[in-house]
Amino acid sequence: MDSRMDQYEVMEQIGRGAFGAAILVNHKTEKKKYVLKKIRLARQTERCRKSAHQEMALIARLQHPYIVEFKEAWVEKGCYVCIVTGYCEGGDMAELMKKANGTYFPEEKLLKWFAQLALAVDYLHSNFVLHRDLKCSNIFLTKDQDIRLGDFGLAKTLKADDLTSSVVGTPNYMCPELLADIPYGFKSDIWSLGCCMYEMAAHRPAFKAFDMAGLISKINRSSIGPLPPCYSPSMKSLIKSMLRKSPEHRPTASEILKSPYLQPYVNQYRPFADISHPIHSLEKPITSSRSSQKSMSGSQCSSISGSDIDSIQSSERNTSGPSTSSNNTIDTEGAEATDHVSVKNCSRSDDVKSNKETVGPELERQDSSKSIHVDQRPRNEIKQPKIIKKILTTLREESKLRQNNSPIRASRVKLNSPSNREQLSDDSKHSSDISSSSKSSEVTSRESAKVICEPVKRAQASPPLKHLSPIVEHSPKAKIKQDEPLQPDPAKQAMEDVDAAVGKVKNRTPPSYSRRLSIPPRRPLGAESPLHADTKRAHNKVIKERAKSPCRPVHGPDNDIIEPPGFPMAPPSPLGGVQMKVGNARAKSAPPRAVSIKEDSSDCSSSTIAYAENTELSEPSKQDSSAQLVSSCKCSIPDAAIQKHDLTAMPSSELNTTNFQKSMASNDDVCENLALEPSSDISEQVSIFKDNVPCSKISQSTANAIVQNDEDKFTVQELLSSVADIAPFVSTKNFALEKGSPPIQSLERTSSPHLNPPIEDVIHVIRHSSFRVCGEQAVAENAEMGVQSSDVGKLLNVVREEVDSRSIPSNNLVPHRLPDCAAPKPNISETNTISSKTACSDVVKFLTVPEVNSTTTAINNGFKEEASPTKEILDVKSFRQRAEALEGLLELSADLLQHNRLEELAVVLKPFGKDKVSPRETAIWLAKSFKGMMNDEASRSSM
């Protein structure tokens, strides 16, 4: 028997997607071009096969002047589904907009397209077909610039007023109710149509953001930019009416056609559409298609959910079950099906590429087990918005998907984005086990059983993504669903949020370094941390202590309450406070307002140092109001290292630089006392270098560090070398600490004669137990204790991001070693009893971990410093700074390549790409941080 393919002459491949290839063919007898969509069933999952059959059946039933023409469909050799559709010479709308190169379309042309699209959508909805993937790249054009709506791979047949809950489509075109995981109906197509019309008018997407959180926020607020002024207010209001947040407030397709403004164009093009083509039964078109489907294996036709069967039977009594399946889930299981990219009927080179939008991939999550009506839902099935995690997970997995597929891409990706592979295999097995005549209750019970069994493997979630959960207005039916408990399953939500957060971090930070800088999610109360067992007990102790006094302020050594007014109290977190014991001192917890994000460091090595990347500095509204600088550092230290020096610190102790109260001097000047605390063998020093800040007069009673009143951003640089080698990487001036009395040497600065010498804002926060200031005895003790260790001087430099180290080379001062003025001492009492009349006459403020203890005669040393030139503010729009950052990244990449450090090179280059989000700040941060690490390692290897 001759194959139907013999009737066609293959010309070229014009697209490739998840199912297979889109091939331009020429009918040998008709001498007419068509598009052949060839789907290889053997490489697809059951759901993909069903979706292919569904598209073949659905498009065969649709016949409308403004919908892509259907020619024929058949199954080739039992393993290929072939769908032949009309060829659109004009390409698609997305390509046409690119060719326009910023030139807006005339309003008449837009209204013509609008009328044709509205007629096509009204035809679909009147026949209970929900397209679910309306976007500009699925709107094709003939050579006469007429509309042809295509790509029905995600279309679904609904009852008259029914809703569906499967999350499908392209994120930029998704409606608020779909993102909120609320059942949606035909109004979701109206929203997508509004997005298309906005994009066709403005030549930019209606909703666009750098990340999924921003996109969801804009969609939930229906926040769109202004349309070009060249269009009439009537057209603008019509487009905006389709983008209303509440589905009830959006017009239907028939109401759009009745709009007085659009009426002339509707009347002009309706005669062609008025030939009222009803949906044909599947018995009429392509009888060979019917016969070939009968020969297909039972597994290919057995995965129709009961709810879809009910929907099909109620709307079309004369059609067969397998052919009318409306279950559209696309599965990503298997290497062959990893890149589910929809094939357009008419695709161009621009469309074959990945979507340029940062949130271009499309996601699909099937809730076939969920019945639409509330009374059919089991009580133990908890429904919650999960689309955010799905989208973020898919964005993270997109890079993996590219590696297993052809370099040619279509413009969207449909992913099931499962939480684990086991669930995927279970879904496939269940879908093949359910016969086409099974009831929806059976499917629902199976799915709910999985929901119950699954969460026990998950950990408690983190809250960073909870603010992303959209809150939308919805229809009465949706409101009934919302009345049900929406509390997320804590164990299930945990892994989703953690995975999403970690996925975002992977694009920005180098996971291959043992010393890594990352922003992990903050765990809520009660979350288990992967630390020692005794650390967990200590955590529990602190948690109980906080539960008793959740809002207890930090007390200084003189019982002064350090509690900046006007700051809201955040909920306490087990990682939010200081959990360190020094001597026999009681471990005090920091106030719950310490909200810096921290990382759970594993107990693998003392070199695993994590620091909060975003150290927040809250800016006061008034000059005399107090603010706080919250920064946190946490390091995992082996027990042996702690016991070696008789330090009674916890095995994985945390350091939280507690709230420094900010106050202002009389003449709007700011000064800052110096906080010093030397460390022993394994010492991490956190140095916050700030620009010089003039001060007019320092009050003798000032007991708190005063921080510069600026919107400061900090970037972490981790330097693992001796302190004397830090100079090239310090972008602001540092105090030199030398031997003798006074231990802190003065630095001269030329200043106005009427001003007192200003003090450089330097805060040294050094880890571990208590210390004692003494003169020569301290030097002798340090000579005995661990100075010879190569690990001394491990330094975390928290440097101003705004300051470019290359622009101030003259001010890089070499910080000397610290053992001259301090030595470790296990007795904590000495740190709290330093007299201002001591022989050293030194002014050193000590920071015992939960407390801030300082003396009041810091001005007696007469600090002076040199004048520094005007600092350079970080400007992401500065081409010079961006060029320097790029140059630094290129040098780093070349160096890594030269040393064959390919894994680290991959980490450096991972955040960049035409389909990746790489803010300019990230590029500059990477250029500085990684280059600093490389230079530091080179200096250590040369020693």
Curated annotation (Swiss-Prot):
Its EC number is 2.7.11.1. Residues 284-385, 398-538 are annotated as: Disordered. Residues 8-262 form the Protein kinase domain. May be involved in plant development processes. The keyword Nucleotidyltransferase does not apply. It comes from Oryza sativa subsp. japonica. The keyword Lipoprotein does not apply. One of its GO terms (biological process) is microtubule-based process. Belongs to the protein kinase superfamily. NEK Ser/Thr protein kinase family. NIMA subfamily. This is Serine/threonine-protein kinase Nek5. GO terms for molecular function: ATP binding; protein serine kinase activity; protein serine/threonine kinase activity. It comes from the Eukaryota. The lineage of its organism: Eukaryota, Viridiplantae, Streptophyta, Embryophyta, Tracheophyta. The active site is at D133. Residues 337-356, 362-384, 423-432, 474-484 have a biased composition (Basic and acidic residues). GO terms for cellular component: cortical microtubule. Residues 402-422 have a biased composition (Polar residues). Keywords: ATP-binding, Kinase, Nucleotide-binding, Serine/threonine-protein kinase, Transferase. Residues 288-329, 510-520 have a biased composition (Low complexity).
